[in-house]
């Protein structure tokens, strides 16, 4: 009989082991056996909880996207009466949170994006994440701009966030957070009306 609470502990162990494996050897070379060994479990446990490697990748990406959502929401909840500018900067901060810019997370995101082009479930997950970012940005810009301008500014800021993140991920170096925040802050202030 399984111990109570063991499922969530095992799932966490396996997701963490998946991130470690992707970080060290890449998604394609990370095997179920390697991931199980890192987690200290049998390969059968992975099959039991996730079916296969694709199920494990999906669960890992759901975990990372959940961390992204939490990072953004925690910052926004701290600014219930904040200006559009402050709330936009909070959204940027959530996207550049350590949970999203660690080496393991960046490599997992890259593997996820590549796999999402071929796997419908991962594609849907990627679309939800992308739409959420754009919707949050447009909503905040729309507090001070007409709808069309807010959509354009939101799209531009989303592209800047993704571009800065992607350049850092592909460089193999940590994201330069001060530079990323400076560039995004400049973009935000350029697009919001001045008092």
Swiss-Prot record:
GO terms for molecular function: DNA-binding transcription factor activity; transcription cis-regulatory region binding. Pfam families: TetR_C_6, TetR_N. Keywords: DNA-binding, Repressor, Transcription, Transcription regulation. One of its GO terms (biological process) is glycine betaine biosynthetic process from choline. InterPro entries: BetI_C, DNA-bd_HTH_TetR-type_CS, Homeodomain-like_sf, HTH-type_TetR-like_transc_reg, HTH_TetR, Tet_transcr_reg_TetR-rel_C_sf, Tscrpt_rep_BetI. Residues 31-50 bind DNA. PROSITE patterns: HTH_TETR_1, HTH_TETR_2. Pathway: Amine and polyamine biosynthesis; betaine biosynthesis via choline pathway [regulation]. Residues 8-68 form the HTH tetR-type domain. It comes from the Bacteria. Repressor involved in the biosynthesis of the osmoprotectant glycine betaine. It represses transcription of the choline transporter BetT and the genes of BetAB involved in the synthesis of glycine betaine. NCBIfam families: betaine_BetI, PRK00767.1. This is HTH-type transcriptional regulator BetI. The lineage of its organism: Bacteria, Pseudomonadati, Pseudomonadota, Gammaproteobacteria, Enterobacterales. The gene is betI.
